[in-house]
Amino acid sequence: QVFDQACKGIYDRAIFKKLDRVCDDCYNLYRKPYVATTCRQNCYANSVFRQCLDDLLLIDVVDEYISGVQIV
């Protein structure tokens, strides 16, 4: 599911898809079920999502992802 109904910000399918992809890729990296679910908690505004950005070497675009989290 791309859209989390708990998120109260702007619904933008492209942003949700981009944020969700980070969690999917992070899950594929570690293969731990809690990574995928925890990464998506609180509309991606959590430390696991930030750690996934680091682990996936997305440091150079972290601000772009964090602004997406603030929108949703």
From Swiss-Prot:
PROSITE patterns per record: CHH_MIH_GIH
A Pfam entry, by short name: Crust_neurohorm
GO biological process: circadian rhythm; glucose metabolic process; neuropeptide signaling pathway
Localization, UniProt: Secreted
Gene Ontology molecular functions: neuropeptide hormone activity
SUPFAM superfamilies (alphabetical): Crustacean CHH/MIH/GIH neurohormone
Tissue: Produced by the medulla terminalis X-organ in the eyestalks and transported to the sinus gland where they are stored and released.
Major subcellular location class: secreted
UniProt modified residues of type Pyrrolidone carboxylic acid: 1
GO cellular component: extracellular region
Positions of post-translational D-phenylalanine modification: 3
Residues found modified as Valine amide: 72
Entry function: Hormone found in the sinus gland of isopods and decapods which controls the blood sugar level. Has a secretagogue action over the amylase released from the midgut gland. May act as a stress hormone and may be involved in the control of molting and reproduction.
Protein name as catalogued: Crustacean hyperglycemic hormone
Lineage per the UniProt record: Eukaryota, Metazoa, Ecdysozoa, Arthropoda, Crustacea
